[in-house]
Amino acid sequence: MPFDVILFDVAGVLLTNGWDRGERAAAIAHFHLDLAAFESRQLAPYDAWERGWTPVTDYLDATVFYEPRGFSHDEFFAFMLSQSQLQPDGALGILKELAASNQYLLGAFNNEPRETNEYRFQRFGLRELFQVTLCSCYLGLRKPESAIYQQALGILGRPAERVLFIDDRAENVAGAEAAGMKAVRFEGEAALRRELEALGVF
């Protein structure tokens, strides 16, 4: 086998982005809020939330509930969660095939806040497919920061060249390659399958 470990990003590879610009705009429209005001407030609170430093309530207090609203934290968060879907032309089928083969240590390597990460893993059955979860909310670091790749390799205990990483963002792929991993940019299920076959994974 060419690799001991195969790591998958989640958003943009297996599932849609749970809270990217489009999802945020949908929530703001649904609750009749001001999108520009929300976006101007959300960057730093989201960074802290995604690193696992603060809970979702702190994020929502900073971005939505800084003044009285006619809806609750729970109602807003439920709408946020409803935005998560399977990624069209995603890699979930490939992940399931690899899991069934029992040939590789499979892991998630993603940027995600704790509450949404745990919801998405449960809703879409990812817990049964991954043996390790290397998420920004548990590591306190975010891709493409160089330290997160080194921390991931330390946790895995495998040489970097024995680790394959799949991500849809060029900067995250470049970060993995700089750390010595083999990295593939995800551009659809068929293209990924061809890449994996060429690498001897299948």
Residue ranges and their predicted role:
Residues D47-F77:
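A metal-dependent, Asp-based hydrolase signature
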Residues G22-A26, A44, D58, A62, ...:
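Alpha-helical elements of Rossmann-like donor-binding domains used by nucleotide-donor carbohydrate transfer enzymes
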Residues D9-G12, G52, L98, A108, ...:
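Generic structural signal for small/hydrophobic residues in well-ordered secondary structure
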Residues M1-L43, A179:
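Active-site neighborhood of HAD-like aspartate-dependent phosphohydrolases
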Residues F31-Q42, P68-A78, F202:
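Short, surface-exposed acidic
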Residues F71-G107, E118, S146, E189-A190:
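Short, acidic loop-to-helix structural element flanking the phosphoryl-transfer center
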Residues M1-P2, P113-F202:
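Asp-based, Mg2+/Mn2+-dependent phosphohydrolase catalytic module
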